[in-house]
């Protein structure tokens, strides 16, 4: 892999440098500095280290410049460890926040890594430079790879979608979304490039770069569309000014079979004008820059600056040459199949569009009429498009229009002419673009193969915010809004809905990303209408303008949250919409014309009649022009691709685009979407620059963070149970028992066997869900398992092949030995004289016998040659006959074959007809059953209709009763109105009387308001109390007058109050009665509606049944048509059969004549002829039987067909009768429904009137009650004043009686006291009002604090407060009398108390604000803690995974150890066996050596006897002269000696043979010994290698365990850091809780003081105290929660400490184990050295054995030295035995050491296992405790959310109760409207039923006709069959006559043979004849 070694140039932009990620320095720096992210104005977020924490603020030091900054805790975001730097999938980040995501994207972007996974989708940042990551090498790298195997890339997304399409058989789509200039078009091209390579490389070509024609065209379609549809904008040099959806179709095997491109909303206005620094479409610049001189002259081209439509002249694009691009466009067009004529025609149209802009109109002097002074440009245009100049100018300047029935010429103004030219240019370019698109689609869909599935790629114009945003920008942004909503809905809503559907544990998360309000603002049709609907509506009005459209939009949508009117209006046609990507200001100028898109039909008709075929083809559908001018002329389109609209229908651009977009969204919803989020890094189009705030805004808008969060928290991978079992059962092979098992149960068993963590998966109803990465892990394990299985299979195969080769070699070895033995025997025999004599004599013995045999053979040969000649002549004759017969046979076989084929066809036809007949019969039976069911239902419906009629009568009676009750209510209402009028008159009188009081009260209220608004003025008025004493006397007189008036008014008010209370009680009773009646009416209406709905439901069921019946009738018609076709084919087959029969008859007669001619030749031919005649007769019989059976079948078919036709006609008549009954019942039901609807309307109107009157009465009652309460308040105030004045008067008179001398002084005192009293009264009133205001302010504050809890209580307490207020006022009246006596002394105390109260109130308000702020901070900290808890939960899950992985590895380690033990035991057994075999072979060798020695001794004895005999012979020869006499005796002794010599020789030979055999045996033994030694050495070596491999594996596992322990240590350190942070947060929480407790205690003290001081003044403060108590209770609960959290944290700390201790213990144990393993390894090394020494000794032994073999071979040559060599051998064998014994003792000692080492290893393993198990159990227990604590916290949180939800519910119920009465009338209205709509639906259904009945009648007539035709055809077939039978009979009789003549009796006798054989022969005979 490229990652391991040095990365290549292209791989640097794909792979991350792992050394940088795993840097220990960076890790240590991150841990030591406590690095975090803080907000930055320049970079978005900046790295900093925490230095100090001050409560809610933190002092941090910036990493970049070392500057210290104070930041709020809530503004800090966590930083990920360095190992997560440049991570490929941002879902893997431990700390997920905006800063981390931005940092990751920034780091990857600056490293050239532009692709990054973000959960389930991919994020792409535009690099603004070329990167070498799109080559063929990269394509091959990504081909067929899984997503996690390769770094992020657009190729990976494309490959995933392609593989998912092939595997799941689901359509896929790749959606590239983002702002304009983000790189959507480029990524779309790369997707197409990748698919073109991947989908065409399957076709078996060697060179994968060679793509097919279709793939080339698919790649070249994009450049053509870009040339004509892309342009340079401010943001993007190659901006798509149209949207396109590329649908690539694939067949089942994954080949591309075709493609189709759909486009959306071409920005055609760009063709006539462009903004500053922008270009029009590329093709104009390509043409002007790249055209050659000849083409320029042909197309009348000029320079860039001479064209008006090129607003900015020539605007170059950096790094792009227009002339080169022009050539590339032409090449692409030629590849797509555009010929040169078509290319030239397209360029002519492009040039004509440019020339249209150069036509200049001027205004005439005296009139507004336009004129064309210079028509040069017009001439050029007409030349290019092939029309007449004069006609063109006339059509532009004075077009003909239709006014009524007359056609007149209308002069155009300059503005109208300019507009007409611009509209023509836009329409021409749009039509050219559409033509090119249709031509491209035609080229891409050449194959006409059916695509199994498709992959769609969406490239649509990105979100645009320009300086001037027009109608095109609205449509583009509306499309992007819909796509973003699709993304949000797919990622967040559908995902969570699937979780809930499948029933897995999931809390629904609302991410708040719903864009529906913005979409509805644009597309909503009504209530209120959206932007597009209002635009369409304005287009209908002739006097409508863009300004009126915007005004109407503001009036309709002014209050919409997403609609704004700009603050600084540049133009009255501007408005703003808040999109998901930001606010966009739209300018609606010329929107009406853009939406209508009108055209001058005079010019279009000219273009339609153009002499240029291409232009005429472009304008051939002139009638289908969108616009108001063509409304009356619109007809169905002549284009095949155009949509067919009704005549006279007006379709606007907005409507068409909305429909197109709706279809696109429906297509996308039906596919599996793969999202690619393109991000623009900066607006300067500079590479290497990334604007942090711009990227952050795009990330927020696109929902990237939310997508990552749901990917992490959710279960994005899911798989169906059956597929999971099928795919991963190999991993848990023995988990599922044999037999049937439910898929879910099987998956549960498999999951248990796989030992997956329960947090990593969820089991639903039909699928199993996994977290990210789990399926990839399972796939890797599956691949490993499959590789192991395949390797085992390969090993078995190789073993089998090796054994087979070995057996073959053994066989070859034995064969070689046999050959060697034979050769050795021959070598021994060839020098033996007797053998030579035998070989010479034996041939001579047979010579005499051979001559006799030769003569006999010659005679036989002569006889045989004669016979052969005769046989040859006979054979020739027979061959001639055979050839003739073979020819005849072939002819007959061909005829028979043709007959059999015909018979088979007719049989198939018969079977088919029988099957169809059976199907028809089954359908008929079903129809009869359904008819019976329909009849039963009809009867039920009639019974229900009767019940309905009865119910209707009951309802009518009830309605009459209700009408009577309504009349009574109206009478009561009239009386109530009269009473109300009287009461109103009385109130008017009272108003007149109390007008003066009200004026004074208003003055006092104004003063109170002034006092409340300005406290400083109140203090100044308190200081100036002395100044007001002079006014006291005048005030006393005025108050006395007022007292009298007030007493009178009070009495009158009391009377009126009593009267009003009586009236009010009466009204309440009446209202209660009315409400009861209304409730009864509602119940009755509800019942009626239920009955109506039931009736409608029944009607719907009847209609559905009728539709089903109609469908079945249609199916029967189809069956009947099929039968008719089968009958026609049967007739044709019959005619064919008749013709063939005639031919057969003629051929039979010819054959018979030929047979008669050949019968006389031989007896064999006569027999053949007799057989053939028998076959002919059998054939005739078979034909007769066939015809009879066929006739019977035809008869049966006719009868059944007629029966079926009769049954169908009966069914049709029954259907007619049922339909008539249904129509009647439907009419009656409709009448009843109409009556019911009328009654419902009357009831609704009556109810509305009653409700209206009831509301009026309630309003009047409320007014009266308020007036009464006001009067009572005024009366109480006046009575207070009266009592005060009386007391004052009494005090003054007492003072006058006491001291008459001091009258003046007393008078002054009285005056001062009076003024003081007046002031104190005013102050009292002001204080009471202030108190009320303060209490109301307190309530408001408490209501704001507890708004979710107390709104219901406030409304209930309002009534109680009124009653309490009356009672408190009465109590205050009595108390004020007492308090006035000592008021002078207490007034100063009251002032002080007032000031103190004010101060305390201010302090309380401040405390409340502080508490609110503290509460907000607590909420923030709680949220932060919750996030940290979530991170801890994620860490816990990771820890659990680590523990489970460790357990798995421990188990694997145990298994490996067990396998090692087994293998070592096997090796020990094998070694024992080998040693036993060696011992056996040694004993055999010793026995052989003994035998050898014995043989040698025998040989020596023989030699000795031989020598003795030779000596005797020599003695005898020498003594011959001496003993010559006795010659006879000597001869005898010679003969005896010779015989003895021969015997001795034979014995010697035998002994030599024995010696040879022993030598051979010894050789074999040595060879076997060598082979065994070699095998033993190889086994030992293999075992050593296996042991070494296992040792390496163990070392590897130890290393892995060490790394895992290191990771665990790091994670523990992270957890410790998190714990410290949590402890700090807890300390902060404790401090906040302490401050809250202190504040609470101070508030309690202050409240107690207030209670002591304000017991007599205000009892309403009790409610405030109760609410405060509740706040304190909640604070106590918070304290408890904080304490519990602190306890939990302490527990966590203890657990962490225990875990750390356990980890240290485990580390120690691990080190001990490592030492023991090292010692065992050293022991093992010594054993290996010992083994090597033994091997060296064995090698020496082998060399010695080889030497012994050489010595043994020398023994065979030198027999004399055999004994010496045997002694040497015996000595060496003795030494070998001693060495073997030494080796055996050494081996035993090694075995003992090995056993001791094994026992030690087992003990160590047991200890390690026990310790590991104890630590794992402790960790699991701690994890369980932590989980319980987390669950407890979750339960508390759920309880809090439940209480909040309950309060919300209460609030909603109160609001619903408030609005219920208001909504009732609206509901009744809606019910009435629903009734009307239901009646309309019923009418529509009636009309549809009538149409269906007409269709049924027509179908019935058609069926009748077809049945008649079928019966006629059946009769004709019957006649034809009869004729055929008669013909067959006649033919058989005619052909049978000559056979009788020729055959005689023999033929007749042979006819008694088996009929079956004759039948078969007959069929063969007919077949051959027919074919001939």
From Swiss-Prot:
Residues 85-783 form the Myosin motor domain. InterPro entries: Kinesin_motor_dom_sf, Myosin_head_motor_dom-like, Myosin_N, Myosin_S1_N, Myosin_tail, P-loop_NTPase. The modification N6,N6,N6-trimethyllysine is found at residue 129. Residues 661-683, 762-776 are annotated as: Actin-binding. Residues 1771-1788 have a biased composition (Polar residues). Residues 1867-1876 have a biased composition (Basic and acidic residues). It holds the Pfam family Myosin_tail_1. ATP binds at residues 178-185. The keyword ATP-binding applies. Residues 1935-1972 are annotated as: C-terminal. CDD domains: MYSc_Myh11. This is Myosin-11.
């Amino acid at each position: 892999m490229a990652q391991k070694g040095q990365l290549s140039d292209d791989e640097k932009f794909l792979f991350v440098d792992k050394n940088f990620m795993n840097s220990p320095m960076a890790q240590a720096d991150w841990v030591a500095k406590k690095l975090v992210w803080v907000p930055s104005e320049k970079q978005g977020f900046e790295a900093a280290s925490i230095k100090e924490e001050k409560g809610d603020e933190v002092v941090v030091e910036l990493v970049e410049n070392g500057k210290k900054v104070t930041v709020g805790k809530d503004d800090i975001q966590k930083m990920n460890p360095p190992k997560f730097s440049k991570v490929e999938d941002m879902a893997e980040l431990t700390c997920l926040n905006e800063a981390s995501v931005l940092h990751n994207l920034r780091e990857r972007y600056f490293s050239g890594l532009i692709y990054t996974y973000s959960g389930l989708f991919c994020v792409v940042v535009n690099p603004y430079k070329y990167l070498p990551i799109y080559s063929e090498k990269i394509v091959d790298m990504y081909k067929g790879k899984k997503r996690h195997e390769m770094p992020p890339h657009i190729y990976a997304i494309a490959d995933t979608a392609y593989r998912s399409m092939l595997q799941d058989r689901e359509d896929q789509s790749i959606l590239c979304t983002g702002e304009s200039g983000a790189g959507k078009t480029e990524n779309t091209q790369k997707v197409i490039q990748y698919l073109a390579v991947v989908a065409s490389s399957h076709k078996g070509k060697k060179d994968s770069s060679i793509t097919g024609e279709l793939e080339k065209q698919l790649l070249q379609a994009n450049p053509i569309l870009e040339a004509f549809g892309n342009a340079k904008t401010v943001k993007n040099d190659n901006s798509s000014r149209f949207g396109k959806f590329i649908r690539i179709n694939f067949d089942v095997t994954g080949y591309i079979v075709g493609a189709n491109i759909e486009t959306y909303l071409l920005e055609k206005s760009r063709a006539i004008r462009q903004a500053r620094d922008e270009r029009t479409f590329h093709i104009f610049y390509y043409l002007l820059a790249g055209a050659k001189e000849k083409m320029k002259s042909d197309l009348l081209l000029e320079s860039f600056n001479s064209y008006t439509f090129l607003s900015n002249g020539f605007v170059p694009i950096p790094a792009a040459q227009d002339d080169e691009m022009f050539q590339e466009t032409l090449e692409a067009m030629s590849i797509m199949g555009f010929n040169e004529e078509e290319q030239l025609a397209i360029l002519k149209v492009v040039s004509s569009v440019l020339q249209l802009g150069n036509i200049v109109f001027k205004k005439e002097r005296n009139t507004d009429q336009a004129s064309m002074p210079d028509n040069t440009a017009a001439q050029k245009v007409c030349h290019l498009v092939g029309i007449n100049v004069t006609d063109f100018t006339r059509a532009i300047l004075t077009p003909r229009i239709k006014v009524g029935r007359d056609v007149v010429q209308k002069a155009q103004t300059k503005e109208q002419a300019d507009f007409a030219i611009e509209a023509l240019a836009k329409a021409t370019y749009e039509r050219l673009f559409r033509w090119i698109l249709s031509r491209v689609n035609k080229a891409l869909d050449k194959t006409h193969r059916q695509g199994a599935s498709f992959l769609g790629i969406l490239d649509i114009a990105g979100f645009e915010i320009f300086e001037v945003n027009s109608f095109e920008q609205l449509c583009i942004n509306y499309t992007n809004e819909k796509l973003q909503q699709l993304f949000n809905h797919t990622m967040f809503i559908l995902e969570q809905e699937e979780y809930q559907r499948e029933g897995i544990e999931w809390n629904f998360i609302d991410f708040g990303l719903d864009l529906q309000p913005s979409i509805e603002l644009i597309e909503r049709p009504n209530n209120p209408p959206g932007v597009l609907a209002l635009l369409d509506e304005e287009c209908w009005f002739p006097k409508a303008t863009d300004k009126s459209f915007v005004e109407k939009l503001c009036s309709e949508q002014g209050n919409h949250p997403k609609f704004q009117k700009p603050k600084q209006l540049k133009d009255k046609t501007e408005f703003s919409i808040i999109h998901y990507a930001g606010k966009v200001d739209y300018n609606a100028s010329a929107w009406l014309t853009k939406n209508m898109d009108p055209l001058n039909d005079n010019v279009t008709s000219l273009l339609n009649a153009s002499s240029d075929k291409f232009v005429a083809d472009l304008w051939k559908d002139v009638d289908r022009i969108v616009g108001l001018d063509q409304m009356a002329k619109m007809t169905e389109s002549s284009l095949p691709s155009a949509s067919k609209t009704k005549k006279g229908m007006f379709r606007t651009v907005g409507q068409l685009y909305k429909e197109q977009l709706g279809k696109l969204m429906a297509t996308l919803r039906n596919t599996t979407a793969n999202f690619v989020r393109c991000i623009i890094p900066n607006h300067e189009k500079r590479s290497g620059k990334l604007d942090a705030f711009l990227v952050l805004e795009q990330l927020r808008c696109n929902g990237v963070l939310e997508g990552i969060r749901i990917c992490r928290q959710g279960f994005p991978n899911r798989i169906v149970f059956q597929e999971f079992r099928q795919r991963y059962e190999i991993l848990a092979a023995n988990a599922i028992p044999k037999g049937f098992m439910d898929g879910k149960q099987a998956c549960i068993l498999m999951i248990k066997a796989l030992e997956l963590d329960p947090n990593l998966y969820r089991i639903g109803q039909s699928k199993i869900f996994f977290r990210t990465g789990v399926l990839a892990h399972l796939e890797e394990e599956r691949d490993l398992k499959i590789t192991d299985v395949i390797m085992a299979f390969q090993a078995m195969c190789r073993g089998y092949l090796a054994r087979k080769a070995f057996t073959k070699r053994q066989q070859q070895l034995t064969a070689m030995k046999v050959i060697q033995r034979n050769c050795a025997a021959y070598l021994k025999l060839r020098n033996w004289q007797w053998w030579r004599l035998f070989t010479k004599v034996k041939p001579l013995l047979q010579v005499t016998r051979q001559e006799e045999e030769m003569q006999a053979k010659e005679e036989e040969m002569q006889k045989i040659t004669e016979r052969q000649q005769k046989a040859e002549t006979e054979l020739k004759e027979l061959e001639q006959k055979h050839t003739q017969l073979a020819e005849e046979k072939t002819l007959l076989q061909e005829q028979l074959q043709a007959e059999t084929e015909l018979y088979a066809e007719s049989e198939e036809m018969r079977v088919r007809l029988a099957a169809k007949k059976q199907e028809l019969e089954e359908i008929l039976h079903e129809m009869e059953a359904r008819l019976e069911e329909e009849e039963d239902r009809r009867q039920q419906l009639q019974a229900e209709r009767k019940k309905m009629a009865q119910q209707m009568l009951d309802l009518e009676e009830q309605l009459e009763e209700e009408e009577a009750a309504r009349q009574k209510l109206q009478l009561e209402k009239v009386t109530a109105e009269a009473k109300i009028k009287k009461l109103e008159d009385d109130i008017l009188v009272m108003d007149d009387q109390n007008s003066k009081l009200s004026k004074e009260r208003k003055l006092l209220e104004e003063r109170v308001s002034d006092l409340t608004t300005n406290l400083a003025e109140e203090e100044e008025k308190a200081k100036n109390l002395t100044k007001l004493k002079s006014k006291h006397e005048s005030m006393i007189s005025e108050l006395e007058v007022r007292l009298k008036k007030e007493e009178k008014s009070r009495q009158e008010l009391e009377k009126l109050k009593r009267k009003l209370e009586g009236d009010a009680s009466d009204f309440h009773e009446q209202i209660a009665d009315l409400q009861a009646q209304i409730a009864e009416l509602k119940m009755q209406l509800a019942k009626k509606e239920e009955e109506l709905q039931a009736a409608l439901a029944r009607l719907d069921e009847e209609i559905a049944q009728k539709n089903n019946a109609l469908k079945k009738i249609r199916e029967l018609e189809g069956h009947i048509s099929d039968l008719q076709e089968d009958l026609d084919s049967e007739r044709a087959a019959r005619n064919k059969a008749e013709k063939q029969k005639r031919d057969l008859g003629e051929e039979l007669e010819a054959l018979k004549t030929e047979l008669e001619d050949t019968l006389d030749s031989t007896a064999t031919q006569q027999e053949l002829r007799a057989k053939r005649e028998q076959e002919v007769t059998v054939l005739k019989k078979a034909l007769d039987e066939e015809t009879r059976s066929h006739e019977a079948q035809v008869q049966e078919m006719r009868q059944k067909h007629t029966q079926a036709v009769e049954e169908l006609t009966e069914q049709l008549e029954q259907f007619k009768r049922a339909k008539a009954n249904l129509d009647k019942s439907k009419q009656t039901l409709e009448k009843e429904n109409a009556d019911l609807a009328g009654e419902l309307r009357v009831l609704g109107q009556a109810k509305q009137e009653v409700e209206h009157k009831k509301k009026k009465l309630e309003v009047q009652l409320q007014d009266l009650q308020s007036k009464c309460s006001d009067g009572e308040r005024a009366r109480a105030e006046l009575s207070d004043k009266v009592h005060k004045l009386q007391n004052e008067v009494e005090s003054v008179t007492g003072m006058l009686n006491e001291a008459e001398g001091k009258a003046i002084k007393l008078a002054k005192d009285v005056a001062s006291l009076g003024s003081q009293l007046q002031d104190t009264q005013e102050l009292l009133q002001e204080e009471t009002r202030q108190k009320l205001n303060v209490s109301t302010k307190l309530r408001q504050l408490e209501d704001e604090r507890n708004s979710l809890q107390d709104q219901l209580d406030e409304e209930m307490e309002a009534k109680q407060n009124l009653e309490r207020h009356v009672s408190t006022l009465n109590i205050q009246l009595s108390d004020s009398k007492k308090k006035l006596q000592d008021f002078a002394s207490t007034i100063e105390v009251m002032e002080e108390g007032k000031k103190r109260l004010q101060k305390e109130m201010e302090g309380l308000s401040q405390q409340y604000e502080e508490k609110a702020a503290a509460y907000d901070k607590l909420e923030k900290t709680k949220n932060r803690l919750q996030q940290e808890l979530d991170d801890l939960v994620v860490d816990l899950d990771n820890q659990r995974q680590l523990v489970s992985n460790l357990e798995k590895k421990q188990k694997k380690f145990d298994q490996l150890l067990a396998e090692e033990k087994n293998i070592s035991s096997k090796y020990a057994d094998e070694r024992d066996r080998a040693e036993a075999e060696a011992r056996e072979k040694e004993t055999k060798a010793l026995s052989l050596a003994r035998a050898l020695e014995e043989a040698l001794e025998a040989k020596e004895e023989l030699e000795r006897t031989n020598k003795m005999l030779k000596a005797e012979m020599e003695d005898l020869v020498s003594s011959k002269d001496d003993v010559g006499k006795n010659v006879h005796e000597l001869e005898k002794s010679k003969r005896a000696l010779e015989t003895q010599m021969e015997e001795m020789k034979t014995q010697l030979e035998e002994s030599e043979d024995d010696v040879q055999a022993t030598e051979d045996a010894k050789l074999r033994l040595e060879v076997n010994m060598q082979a065994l030694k070699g095998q033993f050495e190889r086994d030992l070596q293999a075992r050593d290698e296996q042991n070494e491999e296992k040792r390496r594996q163990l070392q590897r596992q130890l290393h892995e365990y060490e790394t895992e322990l290191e990771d665990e240590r790091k994670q523990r350190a992270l957890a410790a850091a998190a714990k410290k942070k949590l402890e700090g947060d807890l300390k902060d929480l404790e401090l906040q809780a302490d401050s809250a407790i202190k504040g609470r205690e101070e508030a309690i003290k202050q409240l107690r003081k207030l209670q002591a001081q304000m017991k007599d003044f205000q009892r309403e403060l009790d409610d405030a105290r109760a609410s405060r108590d509740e706040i304190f209770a909640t604070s106590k609960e918070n304290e408890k929660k904080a304490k519990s959290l602190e306890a939990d944290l302490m527990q966590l700390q203890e657990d962490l400490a225990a875990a750390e201790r356990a980890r240290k213990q485990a580390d120690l144990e691990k080190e001990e184990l490592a030492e023991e393993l090292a010692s065992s390894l050293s022991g093992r090394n010594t054993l290996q050295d010992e083994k090597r020494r033994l091997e060296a000794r064995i090698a020496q032994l082998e060399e010695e054995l080889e030497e012994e073999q050489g010595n043994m071979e020398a023994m065979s040559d030198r027999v004399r030295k055999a004994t010496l060599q045997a002694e040497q051998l015996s000595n060496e064998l003795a030494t070998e035995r001693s060495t073997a014994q030494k080796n055996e003792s050494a081996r035993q000692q090694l075995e003992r050491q090995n056993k001791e080492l094994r026992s030690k290893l087992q003990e160590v393993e047991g200890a390690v296992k026990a310790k590991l198990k104890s630590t794992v159990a402790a960790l699991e227990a701690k994890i369980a405790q932590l989980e319980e604590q987390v669950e407890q916290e979750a339960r508390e949180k759920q309880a809090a959310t439940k209480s909040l939800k309950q309060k919300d519910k209460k609030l909603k119920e109160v609001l619903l109760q408030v609005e219920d009465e208001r909504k009732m009338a609206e509901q009744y209205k809606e019910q009435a409207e629903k009734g009307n709509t239901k009646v309309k639906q019923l009418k529509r259904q009636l009309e549809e039923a009538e149409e269906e009945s007409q269709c049924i009648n027509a179908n019935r007539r058609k069926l009748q006709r077809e049945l008649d035709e079928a019966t006629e055809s059946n009769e004709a077939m019957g006649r034809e069959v009869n004729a055929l039978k008669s013909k067959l009979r006649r033919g058989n009789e005619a052909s049978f006559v000559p056979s009788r003549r020729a055959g005689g009796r023999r033929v007749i006798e042979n006819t008694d043979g088996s009929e079956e054989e004759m039948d078969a022969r007959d069929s063969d005979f007919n077949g051959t004849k027919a074919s001939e």
